[in-house]
Amino acid sequence: MQLFCWTKAASALMAAAVISLCIPTWTVADVKEGDTITKANMDQAGDLLIPGIKWFVERGMPVKVVPYKKVELPKLFKEATEKYSGQVKLSADGHEIYNYVAGLPFPAIDPNDPMVGFKIMWNQEQKPQYVDNVGTEWITELVNGRGELERTYGSQFWRRMMWTGRLYTDPKPVVPHNPAMRYTEQFGPLFIPNDLKGAGVLNNRYLGVDVPDDSYMYLPELRRARRISVANRSDAFWGADMDLDSLWGFNSKVSYWTFRLLAEKEILAPVHIGTYANRKVWCAQPDGKSGPLAFMPCNINWEKRPVYVIEGVPTAYSQYAYSKRIMYIDKDFWGMNFSEVFDQGGELWKLWFNMFEYVAKPYEGYPVKPLEGGKYNYEDAWAFTPHGMMADLQTVHSTKWDAPSGYVQPTDWVNEWYFNEATPINTERAYSVNFLIQSAR
């Protein structure tokens, strides 16, 4: 808010009187296609820039504005939403949904509903980004505030299989399991660095409100998979800035949090970035000279996006690194544009930052090397997420990724982004501790 004072001289009969009016006004954001927001003109964007992104712009990141492009729900997902959402019920505490089959559980959002925060988060949990399965190879770099590359991790896989809400591959809509599961995901095995070669993480998310995630980390030097305690899910792993609960912006159980809707608004976010697996998205390469520009994106598109701003506060942990999250959930596709994480003192600490290329196919000839058995018949747009990061804004440090690797040619990619493919790696057997260990050998 800015304060302007207006002074008006009185008439001749009241020459001695002066009326001083102080009128509060708010800066109105005025951003249009073709604008580039920088530190010099960032006031022009106003609250279209969230606090975490303002931190980046103040340190040199430009924001190139392109027109908003609506993201449509996938056809089968939209049909399932229309067919089944009317029967879905929310528990009184918001921790559980009943009668869910597929699609969005709560497509009609009423901001005056006292449970609106939980309903939005359940939509985020069953978002159309991940319906049956999804995966990609990835490379991650740890870069400090001087722009130095500290460490590199690479893997041929991050992959997730949904056990509920399935629409494309058999069995559907549910893969039977006791206890019932929502999804399983695997990170790894790593192929770099050498001291962690073969390491991987497996996470099982159960439907039961009080059933904690089953999470395991396989470390080759120990020759066994170690269970990750729920109490450690906010701890950074492998020396990176990210933690299990922060992956993709929010990766915790809905029932372990309380949520409230703070606002419905527009923000600037990268949803159609205009590139894919391209190292040139970054303002600079890690050279020890570029400072934080080495983990900032300069060459991507930003657009005004309608979002729900949700505050999440953890309630089920005896020890937890964060006091709260502020999450920016896209109204079109229910994915997380950004997630701001706050320390126990209430100060902004970290930012999770997704860069989407929401298209049916990211380039002509996609994919160069398809998965065995993959069809890639994508008529709908999907949430390709070729770049992103989690940045520590207090220590000026970042863990950024390219997925797939931007260091190699497409012919060298092993597994680039796929969605809803009926392949051997997307079966129940391929998401187990035994498979995690075997895949590392």
Q: Which stretches of residues belong to each language-model region?
A:
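A short, surface-exposed beta-strand/turn
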Residues: 204-209, 323-338
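Non-transmembrane domains of secretory- and envelope-associated proteins
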Residues: 26-108, 222, 233-269, 273, ...
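Short, surface-exposed coil-to-beta transition loops
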Residues: 197-198, 211-212, 320-324, 337, ...
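N-terminal secretory signal peptides that target proteins for export/translocation
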Residues: 1-7
